[in-house]
A protein has these predicted regions:
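Extended beta-strand/beta-hairpin segments
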Residues: 1-45, 55-134
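Alpha-helical metal-binding/catalytic segments enriched in His/Glu/Asp
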Residues: 50-51
């Protein structure tokens, strides 16, 4: 699995991955044009949408209307470091949602591939074209 990162101008950074070009930019206060999400935005979005696709698949397999499930993700940051310390998935279920599937729905969302990377984080290595590793 590989990704190519490019710099098309300004504070924009693009990533070509799995046949898609994902565009990012910085906010105006950080010198960008605010023309696309920031990399951090996409990071947070990936957590919510990952849990969301697991919830959607769970509902579809059981013929449950997915509009009966609303997910709101809350990120709590450390005030000094600004690092996220807690991610809370608030799952709002409509009265029509079958009670017998509540626990199973949450368990399915807990299988999120992105979330699992927090539980078992990868190692990061930087290598230059002259094989210097950092």
């Amino acid at each position: 699995m590989k990704m190519e990162v490019s710099f098309p101008g300004g504070k924009r950074v693009y990533s070509d991955f799995n046949g898609f070009t994902v565009e990012t930019d910085q906010n105006e206060k950080d010198g960008g044009d605010n023309s696309a999400p920031t990399p951090s935005d996409l990071f947070f979005v990936s957590i919510g949408t990952c849990a969301g696709i697991y919830a959607l698949n769970f509902c579809e397999k059981r013929n449950i209307d997915p509009t009966h499930v609303k997910i709101e993700v809350e990120f709590q940051a450390n005030q000094k470091s600004n690092m996220i310390e807690k991610v809370i998935f608030n799952v709002d279920l409509a009265p029509e949602y079958p009670e017998k599937y509540i626990s199973a729905l949450i368990k399915s969302m807990n299988l999120c591939y992105v979330k699992k990377h927090f539980e078992q984080p990868p190692q990061f290595e930087f290598v230059t074209n002259n094989d210097v590793k950092f």
